[in-house]
Amino acid sequence: MQRAPFQARIDGCRGDKSFNDAAAAGLDKAKKVLKVTFREVSATAGGAASERETKLRLLAQAGYNPVIAVGFLYADAVKVVAAEFPSTKFAIIDDASIALPNVASLVFAEEQGSFLAGVAAAKASKSGKIGYIGGVRIPLLLKFEAGFVAGVKATK
């Protein structure tokens, strides 16, 4: 059985020691363990939504299937491009707003992992002072914060 091309989309670039690196590690493992082939492309960090849309469209036109968008910032682009390519499967990580039959939403219970991080921080703190930096105030990171705070409070 010949495998279809596999496409992954990474927003930003490798080297952020966070979300994008975790996605890239998953791609690397899939390439090694599952023997899938993929093409990795990125839009300019902080670039226009139209650039994300163009990149996704080019991948779909090239026959990559599935096309995976990493991050909620791709929601608008995935919605537009997936509608144009109904035979192509799309997936988006950290967004569940797209109601199209060819789009899979890959979402997580962020507050559960951050709850455990809050517990670990509370147990490790010698001063009783604990901080959390979420970067930006968006619903996704507010869920992280709520889980972290709940974990800290549950430990006291």
Regions found by a protein language model. Give the residues of each.
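Flexible loop/hinge segments that line or gate small-molecule binding clefts
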Residues: 83-107
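Short, well-structured alpha-helical segments in soluble
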Residues: 49-63
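An alpha-beta-alpha
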Residues: 27, 115-156
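Periplasmic-binding protein-like
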Residues: 63-71, 91-93
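Sec-exported extracytoplasmic/periplasmic mature domains
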Residues: 28, 32-35, 61-64, 79, ...
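Extracytoplasmic "Venus flytrap"
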Residues: 1, 6-33, 39-52, 72-74, ...
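Active-site-adjacent structural elements in enzyme catalytic domains
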Residues: 76-83, 89, 108-123
